[in-house]
């Protein structure tokens, strides 16, 4: 583990906190989604994600992706942020999974690579899979970026999601941040005590020790997080300062979400 690795790891943890702060900042913007009741956002975006998964036509899924981009612009979400954090990652991950479909799906061959043929049906299948993932992840990211996490949990609880699920989601969110903070402090401490460049054998020993200590701390941290939440009165019901009341605009937006989702499912059959 060389100094450059320690520095890059510490910078990576810093970027994780920066992205978290970006989500909180975006949620405070005055935009389309931010102006809606959190319950409407959860139900509406979930309806659009469901429509994406049920649609079987590339044109319909592509149209939903355009809708997602328009919603992002109207909600003051950076397109560069979406491209960097969502689209490129989803494209790389899904592309690896969809690549074999180009060759193994039976259909009319349009090109040949030796004894393997690329089929038209295979290209359509791969394109549909990639578009579905890109669009669904975009809608989900918009929900996370435009809604504080506590509001998401309260909206899910208002929609009768079991308390056990709310507790798991709340604990996971807090646990991940505390674990990242602990790991960041460990690497920062190690970097401040490292002089010069370690040999490969020393790098491996240090990496193993750091991973072992972090694992042991993670077990203790999980208990501490749960006990801290319990001591502060958390029982699965999320409390926020704002009082939610559905307005006429919320009902219109909810109707628009459901209508768009239903129309997409009907057109994508």
Stretches with model-predicted labels:
Residues 1-58, 64-69, 179-269:
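Transmembrane alpha-helix interface motif
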Residues 58, 78-79, 161-164:
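Membrane-helix interface segments
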Residues 30, 53, 77-82, 113, ...:
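Membrane-helix interfacial "entry" motifs
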Residues 80, 174, 227:
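Short alpha-helical basic/polar micro-motif
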Residues 56, 75-76, 104-105, 268-269:
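Short helix-capping/hinge motifs at transmembrane helix termini and TM-loop junctions
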Residues 72-78, 146-148, 266-267:
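Structural signal for the C-terminal ends of transmembrane alpha-helices
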Residues 67-77, 91-96:
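Alpha-helical transmembrane segments and their membrane-interface exit regions
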Residues 83-201:
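Juxtamembrane/interface alpha-helical elements of multi-pass membrane proteins
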């Amino acid at each position: 583990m060389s100094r450059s690795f320690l520095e890059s790891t510490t910078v990576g943890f810093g970027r994780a906190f920066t992205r978290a702060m970006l989500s909180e900042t975006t949620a405070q913007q005055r935009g389309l989604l931010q102006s809606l009741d959190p319950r409407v956002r959860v139900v509406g975006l979930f309806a659009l994600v469901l429509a994406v998964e049920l649609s079987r036509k590339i044109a319909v899924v592509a149209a939903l992706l355009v809708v997602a981009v328009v919603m992002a612009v109207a909600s003051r979400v950076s397109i560069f942020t979406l491209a960097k954090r969502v689209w490129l990652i989803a494209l790389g991950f899904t592309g690896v999974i969809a690549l074999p479909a180009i060759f193994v799906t039976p259909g009319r061959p349009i090109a040949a690579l030796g004894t393997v043929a690329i089929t038209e049906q295979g290209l359509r299948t791969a394109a549909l899979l990639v578009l579905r993932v890109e669009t669904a992840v975009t809608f989900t990211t918009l929900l996370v970026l435009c809604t504080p996490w506590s509001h998401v949990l309260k909206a899910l609880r208002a929609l009768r999601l079991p308390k056990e699920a709310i507790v798991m989601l709340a604990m996971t969110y807090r646990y991940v941040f505390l674990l990242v903070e602990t790991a960041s402090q460990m690497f920062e401490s190690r970097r401040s005590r490292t002089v010069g460049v370690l040999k490969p054998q020393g790098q491996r020993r240090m990496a193993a020790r750091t991973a072992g200590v972090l694992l042991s701390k993670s077990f203790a941290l999980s208990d501490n997080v749960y006990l801290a939440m319990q001591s502060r009165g958390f029982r699965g019901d999320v409390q926020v300062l704002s009082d939610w009341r559905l307005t006429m605009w919320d009902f219109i937006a909810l109707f628009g979400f459901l209508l768009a989702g239903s129309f997409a499912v009907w057109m994508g059959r």
